[in-house]
Design a protein with these regions (language model features):
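Helix-to-loop junction immediately C-terminal to a conserved catalytic motif
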Residues: 78
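Conserved ABC transporter NBD signature motif
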Residues: 86-95
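ABC ATPase NBD coupling module
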Residues: 95-111, 255-258
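Conserved ABC ATPase "signature" region
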Residues: 142-159
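Conserved ABC ATPase signature
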Residues: 164-168, 172
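Conserved catalytic motifs of ABC-family nucleotide-binding domains
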Residues: 185
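Catalytic Walker B motif of ABC-type/P-loop ATPase nucleotide-binding domains
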Residues: 189-192
């Protein structure tokens, strides 16, 4: 499909796969189909027969309890882990494991913002953002500088360009991490718990920046989060990992007012306050 970013098809994923080395990183946004984990020992299954599709320019949030495989899904999409079974399609194309030639092309088109920001401690903000651009030789020095400045302006961190990570608040570190990923011009951006550890002030300041980025540049985004209100504030669909599979995607309000088992579990506090 021309408008398809990511598709996961019949994916099975096991805990043992998460310690693997870099595999084949997707070239773009994708779809998962029947993704499964280990069949030999179901205790170690994280995902079993999961399917998910995502259109170009779409944003989706993945919710669910800790330890159920949400972050593992992101690692798999980014190429840091591989499914035991199933297929991942990036922009409508399946890239088999043996296509190692596609690795470098692929990983430049998938950005991954880790929960802890993962900034290089001895590099200033400007150099943290420029590092992957320089490593992959993505332009001349002048072109890289322009991209870095655009990323800093987008996430409003230019005033902190010459500061080191330890001099920044947690909220500002997350902004820098997002700027670093965005500067690579990814077609698919993965975010793992972007609001974790933020106070209300920093959270309120971060979400409009993410919203502005996706609307201005049509970036396709997958957000793994415990903060389900993100789906409401970004007006995007929300899916849950439930019984090792993805639910159908629905709006925040749908889940909030649903009488399903998932809604009663995940929205208990919000429903009780209505």
């Amino acid at each position: 499909m021309l408008d398809e970013a990511l598709r996961l098809e019949d994916i099975y994923l096991s805990t043992s796969e998460l310690s693997g080395t870099l595999f084949s990183i997707p070239r773009a946004v994708s779809y998962f189909e029947n993704i499964r984990s280990s069949e030999s020992n179901e205790d170690y299954q994280l995902i079993a027969g999961a399917n998910l599709s995502l259109k170009l320019g779409e944003t989706i949030c993945i919710g669910g309890p800790s330890g159920k495989g949400k972050s593992a899904i992101l690692r798999m999409i980014a190429g840091l882990a591989r499914p035991l079974k199933g297929h991942i399609y990036y922009f409508g194309e399946y890239i088999p494991a043996e296509r190692l030639d596609a690795l470098e092309v692929a990983k430049r088109q998938v950005g991954f913002v880790l929960q802890n920001a993962a900034l290089i401690s001895n590099l200033r903000v400007v150099d943290n953002i420029a590092l992957p651009l320089r490593y992959h030789k993505m332009g001349t020095d002048e072109e890289i500088t322009k991209k870095v400045n655009m990323a800093m302006d987008l996430m409003r961190v230019r005033n902190f360009a010459n500061m080191f990570p330890h001099e920044l608040s947690v909220g500002m570190q997350k902004r820098v991490a997002i700027a670093r990923s965005w500067a690579m011009d990814p077609k698919l951006l993965l975010m793992d718990e972007p609001t974790a550890g933020l106070d209300n002030y920093n959270r309120r300041n971060l979400l409009p920046l993410i919203d502005n980025m996706r609307t201005m540049f049509k970036t396709t985004i997958i957000i793994v989060t415990h903060d389900l209100m993100i789906a409401k504030e970004l007006n995007c669909n929300l899916v849950f990992l439930h019984k090792k599979k993805f639910t159908e995607p629905h709006s925040f309000d749908y889940w909030l007012h649903s009488d399903s088992e998932i809604s009663k579990d995940q929205f208990r506090d919000l429903q009780s306050n209505e």
